[in-house]
């Protein structure tokens, strides 16, 4: 599923850009959509990318709280910006997107960490998302 892989990568890039610029991710998403419509060299933003970014935006506080709670030895502010946004995207998809198998979410997040972050990041991302996966039933119950 190369299309889903690309959609995740683009969603991560949108979250990363919003974090770096201090701008809401929905504003960045709108910019990307507008830019793709006005510049034929830019690929369109896929439905799945939009679903991931929009879904994340509805859960941003909860996701940041979970990452802060389970990231042993790291505060959200001290965490590398790349890792923080890979974790944000992975946590959203893991906990709230039922159609994607958990193993796929973890693998894709680790691949993003390998591509965009430090040598230590893949194991950090895998460990934290693995912990959230184990807690997923109780995390979703806490939402109700």
Which residue ranges define each predicted feature?
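N-terminal interaction/assembly modules
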Residues: 1-144
